[in-house]
Amino acid sequence: MIKKIFALPVIEQISPVLSRRKLDELDLIVVDHPQVKASFALQGAHLLSWKPAGEEEVLWLSNNTPFKNGVAIRGGVPVCWPWFGPAAQQGLPAHGFARNLPWTLKSHREDADGVALTFELTQSEETKKFWPHDFTLLAHFRVGKTCEIDLESHGEFETTSALHTYFNVGDIAKVSVSGLGDRFIDKVNDAKEDVLTDGIQTFADRTDRVYLNPQDCSVINDEALNRIIAVGHQHHLNVVGWNPGPALSVSMGDMPDDGYKTFVCVETAYASETQKVTKEKPAHLAQSIRVAKR
């Protein structure tokens, strides 16, 4: 899918390294810079791919995901906002509406090291169908040798949220994640609280855990691709570790049957409590990603 994105015809050359393209129904922004290749969908301000020069793709994007208006994209970095997980009210979209609506590219800046982009979503008749509040939501990205994401929300309300990042791995059976802390809510086991005794999360089967006292950096050890991905978290309360495992993967129409084998989600989240946003104090949720050889 990522190769397909970079082979799409250019609709508009925004700058020497930025172009607008289209995949099925969705407008994309493609970054082709000497230090980095990356792509975004305007729907959801969704980072689809990020590949620093000399590295393998860092993010995973499903080859089966549709690029349709209003349909969530499977992979990359979905922005879950203003709620994380199932909606409290029946009939509303899981993980909020921010990932399903078109955003605006507000600004971009390029230098020798990479590209910075800011996307914006504000209240509209469409958002009021889901949520009554006025808001301005900004998604700031800096892509180069590292990837930095900052979700900034303005208004008067409370939210839960996550940067639901899908990381590309060689073989989930040879992946471990450290730095998650010990206490977690096990969403596969009736949301019971449990403890990770050795500090190392592996993914033998379906895993869906909300960690309650994570460190500020999670480390993904990928034995098959012989690399380490360091995931920094800022302004967060939780880190979520997720992989659907074989049975759920087969049931998901936007994922290959064996899709679970080549990704792991390590998510920067504010999920176990609400985050308060006021006019005097906007809220942030931020993630930084670095890659290194093992």
Give the predicted meaning of each segment.
Residues 38-40, 141, 147-155:
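Short, well-ordered beta-strand segments enriched in hydrophobic/aromatic residues
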Residues 158, 166-240:
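Active-site/ligand-binding surface loops and adjacent short beta/alpha elements
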Residues 92-144:
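Extended, loop-rich substrate-binding clefts of extracytoplasmic carbohydrate-active enzymes
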Residues 34-37, 46, 55-58, 133-135, ...:
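Short acidic/polar mixed-charge low-complexity motifs
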Residues 70-99, 178-191, 215-218:
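Beta-strand/loop-rich accessory regions of lumenal/periplasmic or secreted enzymes
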Residues 34-93:
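Acidic-aromatic substrate-binding/catalytic surfaces of carbohydrate-active enzymes
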